[in-house]
Design a protein with these regions (language model features):
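Signature of Gram-negative outer-membrane beta-barrel scaffolds
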Residues: 1-84, 110
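Gram-negative outer-membrane beta-barrel proteins
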Residues: 11, 31, 43-51, 67, ...
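Outer-membrane beta-barrel channels and translocator barrels
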Residues: 30-32, 82-86, 130, 142-144, ...
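Transmembrane beta-barrel strands of outer-membrane/channel proteins
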Residues: 21, 37-43, 89-95, 137, ...
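Outer membrane beta-barrel strand-and-loop segments of large Gram-negative receptors
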Residues: 9, 122, 126, 146-208
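Transmembrane beta-barrel outer-membrane domains
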Residues: 12-18, 66-72, 116-118, 126-130, ...
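Surface-exposed extracellular loop regions of Gram-negative outer-membrane beta-barrel proteins
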Residues: 85-132, 153-178
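Hydrophobic, lipid-facing positions within transmembrane beta-strands of outer-membrane proteins
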Residues: 17-23, 73-79, 121, 131-135, ...
């Protein structure tokens, strides 16, 4: 029954339309610094209909149709400095987004009377936006090889988690467990990356074949 229940609730209708435009600008400073900048605009329009399920009555009903729309401007900048033929430095800044899953957005209600639990969707979810900074330095060996070091930092806004509340009242009824996806807040990630590549064919030429 639980499998059938999940299939009924997850059976929804959704339509997403994304209209986008992009502009790009390239410029070379002197002979060793290159700039590439861009701006992407995305307009997202959503329309969806979910289902409500109550295991006490074993009935499923359609919810009303919900609509939502939003606009995002996503800039990107990349700078490359050719210090010399063997040494390169790169820096970049980008904004990216991740849209909520349809199953989290649809206004569905799933009531489990046996365990006194309720799960509902959240049509007010916002997309997750990531602000990304990257800096790297690459050194190329003349004898075919590369050593690279990099630093990255990401600031993430409105990431999505399942909010779980206990003994929560919803529409006049108290439930032991209430679950709903929500935009939780912000997160910060950073890290270092190192890599080393080298052609070791000079040790054992037979390894090339």
């Amino acid at each position: 029954k639980e499998q059938v229940q999940a299939e009924l609730v997850e059976n929804f209708e959704a339509r997403e339309t994304v209209s986008s435009g992009y502009v790009r600008f390239d410029h070379k400073f002197a002979s060793d610094i290159n700039l590439m900048a861009g701006l992407r605009m995305e307009h997202t329009s959503l329309r969806y209909t979910g289902r409500n399920y109550d295991d006490e009555t074993d009935k499923t009903t359609k919810t009303g149709r919900m609509t939502n729309s939003y606009v995002n401007f996503l800039p990107s900048i990349l700078v490359k400095w050719d210090v010399n033929d063997d040494f390169k430095i790169r820096g970049s800044y980008t904004q990216t987004l991740s849209r909520p899953k349809y199953s989290a957005l649809v206004p569905s209600v799933n009531i489990n009377r046996g365990d006194n639990e309720i799960k509902i969707g959240n049509s007010d979810l916002k997309p997750t936006i990531s602000y990304n900074f990257d800096l790297s330095a690459d050194y190329y060996f003349k004898s075919v090889g590369l050593v690279s070091a990099g630093f990255f930092y990401k600031k993430i806004d409105d990431f999505i988690v399942d909010q779980v509340l206990t003994n929560y009242e919803y529409q006049g009824t108290e439930y032991t467990r209430f679950t709903q996806p929500k935009n939780a807040g912000n997160a910060n990630l950073w890290g270092l990356e190192f890599s080393y590549q080298r052609d070791f064919g000079f040790i054992a030429p037979a390894l090339k074949y």
